[in-house]
Every structure is written in structure tokens, then in C-alpha cells.
Design a protein with these regions (language model features):
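Short amphipathic alpha-helix that is part of the acyltransferase structural core
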Residues: 1-15
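Conserved catalytic-core motifs of GNAT/GCN5-like acyltransferases
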Residues: 100-114
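Acyl-donor binding region in acyl/amide transferases
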Residues: 46-97
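Short glycine-aromatic motifs
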Residues: 1-3, 20, 94, 99-103
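Short, hydrophobic beta-strand segments that form beta-sheet elements in well-ordered domains
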Residues: 2-5, 22, 82-86
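Conserved donor-binding loop and adjoining core beta-sheet/short helix segment
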Residues: 17-63, 104-106
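Short, charged/polar, Gly/Pro-enriched secondary-structure boundary elements
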Residues: 117-119
């Protein structure tokens, strides 16, 4: 398994948790199929959130890397780890950054951030 961030490759989920910047693609069932690796089955959705946001150009209906890097940087500056935030907090920060469309999963985690123009 090779998880990707701009500075290094991560070999474990623990490293992924530490760096949180991952480049992955998603199949039609929402499973993580990455160009650099696959997250283990059963990885909580909360830990996969950035993977689902930070997808490749193969999935143009979801926001691309450059916007996700902005999002990651913003959360980092605010002292948050993205997957630890509540849905209302996520909504607030998405709104601040111009993420106007998103869907929620039944378990309460925001799953998809759709590609759209920032207002």
C-alpha cells in the first residue's frame, strides 16, 4: 500500500493519519482504488474523507487536488484534523471555502464534495 502526499509516500494507515494528504481514485461503489495504493477494507469513512475529496482528474464530478489542498491547509491553520470534526463544523468550513454542494452519508460523515464554481 502506498498512500501519497506532496512530500512523501506513506506505507501505513498510521502514516496516512499523520499526513492526511492522499491522492486516490474511487470506483462506482465508493471503494478506494488508488493509483498509489488501496486503503484497507474497514477503514472508517472519517479517515477516508480526504481520500474521497482529493480524487484524481478521472472523477471530474468531485473537486480536484488544488481545492483540496486549500481545504487541508485551512483546517491545518485552524488546528483541526479534518476527520475529527463534526458535520456542523465541516459544513461551516466548507461554506467558508466556497464548497457549496455536498452530500452526507447515513452515518453522518460528509462523503462527496461536488465540483462547482466558488461563489
Amino acid at each position: 500500500m502506498r498512500l501519497y502526499n506532496p512530500n512523501k509516500y506513506c506505507e501505513t494507515v498510521e502514516e496516512f493519519d499523520k499526513y492526511m494528504i492522499v491522492k486516490e481514485t474511487i470506483d462506482g461503489n465508493g471503494h478506494m482504488i488508488g493509483r498509489f495504493g488501496v486503503l484497507p477494507v474497514g477503514t472508517p469513512w472519517s479517515k477516508q474523507l480526504l481520500c474521497q475529496i482529493m480524487v484524481s482528474e478521472d472523477y471530474p464530478h468531485v473537486r480536484l487536488i488544488k481545492d483540496c489542498l486549500r481545504l487541508c491547509e485551512h483546517f491545518d491553520k485552524m488546528g483541526y484534523r479534518l476527520y475529527a470534526m463534526s458535520v456542523p463544523e465541516l459544513r461551516r468550513f466548507f461554506d467558508v471555502l466556497g464548497f457549496k454542494e455536498y452530500g452526507e452519508m447515513d452515518d453522518g460523515y460528509i462523503r462527496w464534495i461536488y465540483n462547482g464554481k466558488t461563489q
